[in-house]
Amino acid sequence: MDFLLWLEQTGLSAWVRESSSLWAYPTILFLHTIGLATVVGVNAGIDLRILGFAPEVPVAPMTRLFPVMWVAFGINALSGTALLIADATTKLTSPVFYVKMIFIALALVDLRLLKTHVFGDPFIDKGPLSPNAKILAVTSLIFWVGAITAGRLMAYIGPVSGVR
């Protein structure tokens, strides 16, 4: 707990938590929201296409969206870290935080498997997608819904945050 208290008292943490600057908490939260919307939105679009929605859209060109998702995830990781250190004693002592992290980790593993096994197939648009591709798409959607739900529940379950 001493480390969490120290982390919460660093200059960056105090600035994120206490600054009246628009560049502090509001901008970081905005970036976190945009990053999340991009990662999950693009990933969900790919998942839905794999599940058979919009069959006229070829799957193979969607591989170009993976770098967009990774950049958005990087923004999310950085902004999430800033939000986390601003309220470390609350968030890092909440079991819901760890549930969220597990769902994110599972979603990222799923995304990697999708990229390797589905988009790695040179005949991806030549026939129906495999049942395994569809399973990866469904589990991806489940993992992202779980991560988002856990993230929202952090505001309502567990220790009460001192942050806005």
Regions inferred by a protein language model and the residue ranges of each:
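Polytopic transmembrane helical bundles with strong interfacial aromatic enrichment
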Residues: 1-164
